[in-house]
UniProtKB/Swiss-Prot annotation:
Domain of life from the UniProt record: Bacteria
Pfam families for the chain: OmpW
Signal peptide from the UniProt entry: 1-23
GO cellular component, as recorded: cell outer membrane
Keyword Membrane on entry: yes
Keywords of the record: Cell outer membrane, Membrane, Signal, Transmembrane, Transmembrane beta strand
Protein name as catalogued: Putative outer membrane protein RP075
Family annotation (Gene3D superfamilies): 2.40.160.20
Keyword Lipid biosynthesis among UniProt keywords: no
Subcellular location: Cell outer membrane
Family that this chain belongs to: Belongs to the OmpW/AlkL family.
Amino acid sequence: MLRIVKKLWVILFISNISINSFAKNIYDNVDDANYDSTQYYENEGSLLFKMRLGGIFASAKQKGLPTHSSIQAVSVGEVAKNGYGGDASTTIFFNNYLAAELSLGFNVLRTKYTSLAAVAHNYGVDNVKLGKHKPIYMIPATLTGQFHIAPYGGIRPYIGIGYHGSYMLTQATGLKIRNGYNIVGQIGVDFYAKDDTLINMDVRQFFLKPKLEYKPNLVGNKKVTSKVKLNPLIVSIGIGFTF
């Protein structure tokens, strides 16, 4: 029993010396630290300019098409495929956590001519010549309020919610698309490379249901309209600069 007690005392003594030595080293390191050289990025009052490129994922399902008179009707399907685009944005920080981002984008969605041919078959002129594929252009102006979850250090995630108005345009044969507007959700992260330079990864979900109108050269003298559930998801990567 006495032997065990002696061993315990030896262990405690050695442990005490080790802890004291470790604590002294930490204290010395704190004293010697140069905080002026430590990377520390402050958001408050700054402006952030970003440029991004990305891919677009859209469903483009149509709703509200009128009842057709075709005996051998075919499924209309989606009117557009996935696409690509880019945007430029300016972010102003009200404090380290809250910011507002204003962005202007230019996006391209590829039309599915099988859908246009199906509309022509069901409602109007069969075997219509559709010509070359013409895309749908989406030009959104977006204002987003952001909350920066961890605003210090080199990695800064954020979330946001806002509103967009999108100018829609296409030169596709027999198709006209109206402008749209709705809410947009956002999540992203900034990777700071230097004090004023960063890499940005951003995901935005646009909610958008523009109105489609089919022209007489596709459907004859009938009035055929529908709502398309576009709801594009835009995944982007880009660079940014603070001012």
